[in-house]
Amino acid sequence: MDQFPESVTENFEYDDLAEACYIGDIVVFGTVFLSIFYSVIFAIGLVGNLLVVFALTNSKKPKSVTDIYLLNLALSDLLFVATLPFWTHYLINEKGLHNAMCKFTTAFFFIGFFGSIFFITVISIDRYLAIVLAANSMNNRTVQHGVTISLGVWAAAILVAAPQFMFTKQKENECLGDYPEVLQEIWPVLRNVETNFLGFLLPLLIMSYCYFRIIQTLFSCKNHKKAKAIKLILLVVIVFFLFWTPYNVMIFLETLKLYDFFPSCDMRKDLRLALSVTETVAFSHCCLNPLIYAFAGEKFRRYLYHLYGKCLAVLCGRSVHVDFSSSESQRSRHGSVLSSNFTYHTSDGDALLLL
């Protein structure tokens, strides 16, 4: 992946075999387009993921391993979206960022980026263990194991993100990678390959396998509620694929551009424009994570109802009771048969409900 975000002060791209290519119009469009969408993604992602954090930390029920992973997914998304205002400032301010802020913003961005992808992958593996290998995984799906695995995931995210930010510095009003001469040609390629493989292809393969096996297991279960669970599974995989594939294709094409596969100026301009558009689509995935992974669960709906009641009480100046217990309990009774087929072997009753 090119150093994020794209340079907004460089109006020309140069090539040893081609004339200077003017991309000033694309840069101006990218500045306006990305600034607006970064602000929108920041606002929505901040609210959604904070709700997940508040719901999990304020819940009086005992924590489960699923809760641990969902909490860390929300934290990684928050770390990711927290950098977007700084990138917006970088886009619209000619002076860019201070050197220290450039380093920290880039580091937090990529740690949150890879952390979010890794925790989504871990959640798919956890669901595979809870449903497909329920009897064998009972002793391994504890809160203590969840905390240990989460710490390992954060360590892996930092390790994988390091090549993306270790050479970053503020140089001539741009937050860019300043590589040693011996690494100037190979390092950008390695970064792109790492992002494509560890940030997309490998997680997608793991998710696809885990959810395929889960669907196979659900099909063997005689229950009319399995259709809803299967739809949620397909939604998780399809949304991940649709939101991240275009962006990763553009990263791959950017890698090819480093080897002069696109000498035409028009093609380079099209690539730059496409990268800006697909970038916003991919980054907005962090806004959907709370909806897909958290708010589908009963405890999160209960917390939202509780929060809604508190807001009404503040607005109305008196206590307001929101009655949702009957509808929730009825829904819980209807869905209990499917859950019991798998979770009686596990330590986490939410394993199937949070598909």
Swiss-Prot record:
Induction: Expression is down-regulated by miR-27a-5p microRNA in natural killer (NK) cell lymphocytes in response to TGF-beta1. Residues 1-31, 91-103, 168-195, 257-273 are extracellular. PROSITE patterns: G_PROTEIN_RECEP_F1_1, G_PROTEIN_RECEP_F1_2. Pfam families: 7tm_1. The modification Phosphothreonine is found at T346. It is linked to Macular degeneration, age-related, 12: A form of age-related macular degeneration, a multifactorial eye disease and the most common cause of irreversible vision loss in the developed world. In most patients, the disease is manifest as ophthalmoscopically visible yellowish accumulations of protein and lipid that lie beneath the retinal pigment epithelium and within an elastin-containing structure known as Bruch membrane. This is CX3C chemokine receptor 1. It comes from Homo sapiens. The gene is CX3CR1.
